[in-house]
């Protein structure tokens, strides 16, 4: 019993000492951008990974009448001098309606030429990251980053014509690691540019990705340590997922380009 009390006392002292050395972040950033882009690609969804339960590399976004999409992106970060932690979210949700120009099988449901199909898609990414600033001079900063990324997918469709289908859905999540970084250059006190590039480390079902953007920020308001900045820029996004089912795989490949980005940033 005495040994347990001694160990508990030592543990309590260690925790107290660690907590005493902790400090609150010295700065925070909240950034919201809304993205407008043109998407291409396909979503191949079998049933149970079995042969002949999906058309290969179909349906394409083009035949689903999905071309131009828009979606939100959020960044919330905290920094202790050069070290930072953050959460980033990209919620790419879009839909389309079309009349099929040829037969289609998807999720083991047979649709015929002339059938009407409406579909909803979700490609959402939730990224939890660490960063470290290397300030090369008063204007230029390089920031390598590493993230644990959770991919949230949903594919839902309905159809009328040769058969009636109501809200058939396939959804799942997948986790992976992303690496990359950003380069920031301050031209003046009020205007700067940020180049941001991230990619998934290929693992399991996530085969490849590239998320790149070049954005400018212009200061709208500054008081003490508080800033409000306007954000505008351009980007590119690609993502390839193919699971490990033996016969037929859930297989999604998409590119969004160019992406036009508009937003606002709060620093305090």
Question: What are these regions, as identified by a protein language model?
Answer:
Residues 39-70, 91-125, 151-173, 201-205, ...:
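Extracellular/periplasm-exposed beta-strand and loop segments of Gram-negative cell-envelope proteins
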Residues 26-32, 74, 83-87, 128, ...:
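Transmembrane beta-strands of outer-membrane beta-barrel proteins
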Residues 19-35, 41, 224-227:
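Outer-membrane beta-barrel biogenesis signature
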Residues 34-40, 80-82, 89-95, 134, ...:
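Transmembrane beta-strands of outer-membrane beta-barrel pores
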Residues 25, 80-83, 135-139, 186-190, ...:
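Outer-membrane beta-barrel channels and translocator barrels
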């Amino acid at each position: 019993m005495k040994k347990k009390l001694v160990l508990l006392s030592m543990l309590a002292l260690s925790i107290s000492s660690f907590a005493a050395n902790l400090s609150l972040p010295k700065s925070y950033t909240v950034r919201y951008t809304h993205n407008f882009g043109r998407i291409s690609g396909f979503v191949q969804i079998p049933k149970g990974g079995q042969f002949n339960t999906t058309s290969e590399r179909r349906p394409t976004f083009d035949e689903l009448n999905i071309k131009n999409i828009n979606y939100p992106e959020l960044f919330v970060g905290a920094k202790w001098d050069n070290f930072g932690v953050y959460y980033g979210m990209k919620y790419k949700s879009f839909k389309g309606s079309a009349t099929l120009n040829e037969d289609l099988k998807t999720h083991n449901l047979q649709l015929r030429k002339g059938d009407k199909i409406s579909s909803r898609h979700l490609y959402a990414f939730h990224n939890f990251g660490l960063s470290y600033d290397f300030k090369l001079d008063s204007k230029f900063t390089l920031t390598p980053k590493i993230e644990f990324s959770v991919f949230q997918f949903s594919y839902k469709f309905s159809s009328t014509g040769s058969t009636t289908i109501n809200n058939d859905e396939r959804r799942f999540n997948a986790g992976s690691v992303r690496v990359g970084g950003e380069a920031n250059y301050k031209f003046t006190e009020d205007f700067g540019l940020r180049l941001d590039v991230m990619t998934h480390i290929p693992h399991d079902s996530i085969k490849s990705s590239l998320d790149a953007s070049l954005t400018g920020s212009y200061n709208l308001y500054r008081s003490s340590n508080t800033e409000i900045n306007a954000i505008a820029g351009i980007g590119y996004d690609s993502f390839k997922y193919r699971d490990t089912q033996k016969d037929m795989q859930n297989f999604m490949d998409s590119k969004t380009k160019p992406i036009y980005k508009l937003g606002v940033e709060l620093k305090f």
